[in-house]
Amino acid sequence: MGIKPTYIKKIGIELLEFHEEKFTNDFDENKKAVASATNVPSKRVRNRVAGYITRKINTGKFKK
């Protein structure tokens, strides 16, 4: 889908650092976790952040 904007990456990395236990490799569960952990006003941004987090977990590229 292309390169993610830096604000998506920043939100995703912060969420993974502080709430890692909430996220899994399932996109739908991550959407709910992003909605509960943040106050992102738009569905589009929430879905992009959830997708970024899911991709990081599935590829194993997230490191503490």
UniProtKB/Swiss-Prot annotation:
Signal peptide: none annotated. GO terms for cellular component: cytosol; ribonucleoprotein complex; ribosome. GO terms for biological process: translation. Pfam families: Ribosomal_S17e (PF00833). Keywords: Ribonucleoprotein, Ribosomal protein. SUPFAM superfamilies: Rps17e-like. The keyword Ribonucleoprotein applies. One of its GO terms (molecular function) is structural constituent of ribosome. The keyword Lyase does not apply. It comes from the Archaea. HAMAP family: Ribosomal_eS17. Belongs to the eukaryotic ribosomal protein eS17 family. This is Small ribosomal subunit protein eS17. It comes from Methanospirillum hungatei JF-1 (strain ATCC 27890 / DSM 864 / NBRC 100397 / JF-1).
